[in-house]
Amino acid sequence: MENVTEGTWDSLPQKLNGSIRRTLEELKFTHMTPVQSATIPLFMNNKDIAAEAITGSGKTLAFVIPLLEILLKREEKLKKNQVGALIITPTRELAVQIDEVLSCFTKHFPQFSQILLIGGSNPVDDVRKFKEHGGNIIVATPGRLEDMFRRQADGLDLVICVKTLDVLILDEADRLLDMGFEASINTILGFLPKQRRTGLFSATQTQELENLVRAGLRNPVRIAVKEKGVAATSTQKTPIRLQNYYMICKADEKFNKLIAFLQKRKQEKHLVFFSTCACVEYYGKALEMLLKPVKVMCIHGKMKHKRNRIFTEFRKINSGILVCTDVMARGIDIHEVNWVVQYDPPSSASAFVHRCGRTARIGHHGSALVFLLPMEESYVSFLSINQKCPLQEMTELIISVDLLPKLKAMAETDRAVFEKGMKAFVSYVQAYAKHECNLIFRVKDLDFSSLARGFGLLRMPRMPELKGKNFSDFVSTLIDTDSIAYKDKNREKQRQKMLKERKEKLETEGRKHFAKNKAWSKQKARKEKKQKVALKRKKEEGSDIDEGDVDELLQDTRLLKRLKKGKITEEEFEKQLTAVGGKSEVEEGSEDSN
């Protein structure tokens, strides 16, 4: 099913509940989007749905509304701890967002309790909340939900609670699989009753997703919704109200271009994407220092407890910058995002589309810009062909001030900045080497000197990818980087303590090494003693060798070793060897005379 259009809520075959209609009016949703128009009637008619629609097309309401309608029509009212609907989504941020949208509706239905189960909170608290307040509708991330199913020892048996399940929603299903949740999803599906309605929503279709459809859905209706106004032969995957731009610049120009771009738009709200968590940490700090008083916030996948707070705070502010990784690339709906800036292209072409889709949400206008190196220019054509995502070049940006010296000065005066810069550079190169489109993004073609200057590095880091490379056009700082201190006095105090302990350890290990040498000498003496015993045994067994022969043999061996090590010359060796032999002969003569 593809040819669907927008329509009013009253045009639905089944009339919506009055409270749901009032909520839609409160939220100022007067018309359905194409995906809502296609999905809601089928879902309300008890069909399983596999829906593919572009990012920002209104998929959340496409499952929230029929989910509530199905629960309202239940013959038997749900008890507090009975689960009627389950929504699984890949990230905490998306789960929080869905939970908020759902709350706008459930506040009119006190008979339904809802609960949010995501990482970053104490699972024991989640169990307590569920037992106290119930959870007729659960919004969850896969990891936490799987953990809750296994927590029977805490007095909650979620397996029993989901026996009443009517609706299962897998939101951003392709991302669920991309993020490695396939095993968790299969485990969760094993706990759920077969008699249920299932809705699977995604922005792209893959073979892995097809396998999930076969495993989790029964005779699903497949829906692929295109943008209204897009030609039938086209399958453009970004909203038509989104303007996509690209800019070609050298690696050591990118940072200055980014600053110039953001300074011109200080009163607006932007997302700036980087390829790694370390790059977010480093450039986020740099932007915060150089763009004051603009509000700059950072979020990435390695943040545990702060992510939810930062995400909520950014959604509330009217202007500012959120520096992030692809943790923010899917499904997140932040109002009034003016620009999505991709400082680094993402690791896959599909992720490019999802990043852009954080602006121009549900009918709003928005713009996106990606910075590309000269060697990456063919990526523009690749996106146009592979993702049906046309881009136009932005050329008018003028750099007024070179801020790279300031970036280096920050590293020279604070070890935290210096270390973050080195770590960011290494992580960027490693991520670049793993790029999905490696015919365009070739790590061997990178200008590492220009890249290092763009990162404001004081010296080149040691890493395998740089082995054998020439960096004649990169000038390292004259400062001894080991002497750079942390601005944070406590961290610097701790560092000095560690340096002192390391020095003492090295000195101790040196003394131990000396002791080992002495022990080796003893070992050598024991070895010689063994040789004597062995030779003596041979003599007792009838050998012609006597103790004098043994001593002479050992002395000859020692002399030979000294010669090999260069401790004596050949002349000295011959002389001492003769002396040893002469001595033996004298001793033998005296013994014969006796």
Curated annotation (Swiss-Prot):
Residues 502-512 have a biased composition (Basic and acidic residues). Residues 532-561 are annotated as: Important for nuclear localization. ATP binds at A53, I54, T55, G56, S57, G58, K59, T60. Residues 40-223 form the Helicase ATP-binding domain. Residues 486-542 form a coiled coil. InterPro entries: DEAD/DEAH_box_helicase_dom (IPR011545), Helicase_ATP-bd (IPR014001), Helicase_C-like (IPR001650), P-loop_NTPase (IPR027417), RNA-helicase_DEAD-box_CS (IPR000629), SPB4-like_CTE (IPR025313). Its EC number is 3.6.4.13. It catalyses: ATP + H2O = ADP + phosphate + H(+). Its main location: nucleus. Keywords: ATP-binding, Coiled coil, Helicase, Hydrolase, Nucleotide-binding, Nucleus, Ribosome biogenesis, RNA-binding, rRNA processing, rRNA-binding. SMART domains: DEXDc, DUF4217, HELICc. It is found in: Nucleus, Nucleoplasm. Pfam families: CTE_SPB4, DEAD, Helicase_C. GO terms for cellular component: nucleolus. Residues 254-411 form the Helicase C-terminal domain. A motif (Q motif) lies at residues 9-37. It is an enzyme of class 3 (hydrolase). One of its GO terms (molecular function) is RNA binding. Residues 502-548 are annotated as: Disordered. The keyword Glycosyltransferase does not apply. Probable ATP-binding RNA helicase. Has ATPase activity and is involved in the maturation of precursor large subunit rRNAs. Belongs to the DEAD box helicase family. DDX55/SPB4 subfamily. This is ATP-dependent RNA helicase DDX55. The gene is ddx55.
